[in-house]
């Protein structure tokens, strides 16, 4: 008879570089083998336990929550949670061990077991030579909650090991049980487990020796095999332990912070009070009946679901940021909420945004999950907000969420190739065969191009193991700003560990796992554009005396939309990429809602769902606007009958298939997960059958489902697009009407966006803005505005652009200059106490031009600056001027780019124009006269390479010359053939043909040629987005 069995010692792949199987694989196999329960006992972590709980529910197999916990200098234990108290004790132990060590490590000490550990069961993984005193120490702490685990893996000493451990258990009167020390679900993962061990030990597999297991027995074995190895009583004891463990994650009771509610109020009344204040602020003349009705509906639902404290918490964070003059704006599904707008969390007025925002997208009675509010803050000041949260709630009750960083193709190939002994140069070359975020192994053609033999057995082994590793968690990193805040210490819910950054702590659960256990998350995110907008408003106020805010900018400005329709959008928010620029002259936005669509339409969802071209044809009157039924007209009217947003898919399901709001939100979540888990399949039958019953055609229902699958790739929420469109419009209005201030603010806020400071400044110059060089007599650390003869001020370059120059030196220069102007280089260096490095940096960058002349003279001047000794204090050390040659234009150009990454002299391509013309290369200006389909040759500096997820391997390259930019399309096969030229060239020649339609011009590449040697040392870098 086959014995029953529960595995009580099993590692998943969240024991990083140890466990060689996912929780899903482990539970599916354990269920097939007829196990009664499975304990997931990852090493000093519960990082994977939520996913294990999910897998347990899907397979119907009981999960036991536990952890493998070696004590420093002491016994090795497996601890299992018997009940809620035991789970909380386990969380506390893991937290203590992790917090006293650096990130990624832990130290569990004997003293940690001096406090009561009620509800925690312990399995002692003793060796046969273990001392009786060790067992007595454990027995004292765990009493009848202690077992001795016996693990047999068909070693030559199994019989002796079993006999000795049973004798030890008998002497100490500790019950013994069977354990598997499981590291993989099936024997076939042994090679991967060996490889992971080598990766963990930083050794090749061939040298890992004793670190490797001697066989593949550490997998989930058939119960018949276990019966051959273990006495029946050891197997039966596993069932008794499993029966005692009845803790489940749904027993966790999460409570929101309550201290924000003043005396005399409860959370509900105080939230209502705050909302009423917000309504008076947002609608000084009184809110409409429609708004009042919506607010009442939302407040009733918030109160019913007991989320009042959540909204008050987010409101508190946003209010504090506004008081510190930190620009912020909520985005995502929160923009569907009128309550969030009234509280100042979001800036999108749901009453007049033009969008049909769906509150159920944000909060639903049928969804047993908290809402998720994302708030963007200025990227340079977000840390202030994060530290405020830590101060407000304390580190015991606030922590960032984790992100499980997983293996992609390149990383998996790199680690596996290194572990299997490939030489370092070949490791890098092989990893480069994969795209940065690709989850696929390179094909044979790519491998041959890189010099590898695709038929090599050793290479096949590397590719196979790397393919198995893809998707495995590699380590825990911190979420950029996802906070979990609790009424009680977080370690009663989940273990907390140190982050890599100082002054931060992180819970062990991934951000995507929080919804399943009902934890509140507030996303405190960073957005560079908010920093740029705040700086731009400040520059305008300082220069013109005009105070603008996001809310006060003139709306629906014709000049702004005309600029957008020309695709004159370098540096603006969201519509600055080459793909967006190509779409702008075709869509030609004229209203705010057009911008909402523009933000959303160049996304994988609409593109893969084949929605872009039908929308454009209908917008341009090239095909009629049709609706599948009158009842769907209100759903699709604003997008001309074409579904573009997630909310429309939800509305369609509710109208055409009688989905409840909760079912519709379930559909939305399934869309996001369908590629990973096939989550849309349950909806295929439900949706199509209900639509057919209501009279829709089979063709229409099939087409709708294809579009829904397209949204699964990246369907953009309308609320998200509308929130972003607010910033898009603001950035465009400022670029149109205050281009100098806007360009200045962008450069001061860099790094951000698609374009480097050089490209932003060159664009400003093309728009007639005077840009003045960095000069110690006038420059601050930041770029600034100065009066000019034109309508727009001039931009004075700041010292922040000088490579290697320190901010503290710039601040001293500013402070001493305010006292009195500098008379010469010696005066500057002496009063501002500049060291040799700072002096040389200023001279090389030309920032001493006003005090010393050209670069050569400035270098001579700073070389002669010496500290003044007291003995010679009264002696003049001035030397007679030395005759030095002037730098050539080419030398100045090279030094400009080397020292501050841009030039105010001629563009590099202007100096090369005659040589390029001799090579029959046209300029960007000359392309304007070339007819569609004609062959052309162009050359330019490579300033950007983009490979969108939806482009089927196509790479979009942006070239820049002295007149502007050239958009280049490189098809997949050419990109593969000339990969090195494509990715490494700084000056690139394209031979191909011109495509021109609807005001959009592209060069379709046929051949690529690297002309970089013509630049002779010029330091120009591309901004690449793969």
UniProtKB/Swiss-Prot annotation:
Compartments, record wording: Cytoplasm
Keyword DNA repair attributed: yes
Keywords: Cytoplasm, DNA damage, DNA repair, DNA replication, DNA-directed DNA polymerase, Nucleotidyltransferase, Transferase
Reactions performed catalytically: DNA(n) + a 2'-deoxyribonucleoside 5'-triphosphate = DNA(n+1) + diphosphate
A Gene Ontology biological process term: DNA repair
CC annotations in GO: cytoplasm
Pfam families in the record: DNA_pol3_alpha (PF07733), DNA_pol3_finger (PF17657), HHH_6 (PF14579), PHP (PF02811), tRNA_anti-codon (PF01336)
Function: DNA polymerase involved in damage-induced mutagenesis and translesion synthesis (TLS). It is not the major replicative DNA polymerase.
Matching HAMAP family: DNApol_error_prone
Protein family per UniProt: Belongs to the DNA polymerase type-C family. DnaE2 subfamily.
Protein's name according to its UniProt entry: Error-prone DNA polymerase
Organism: Ectopseudomonas mendocina (strain ymp)
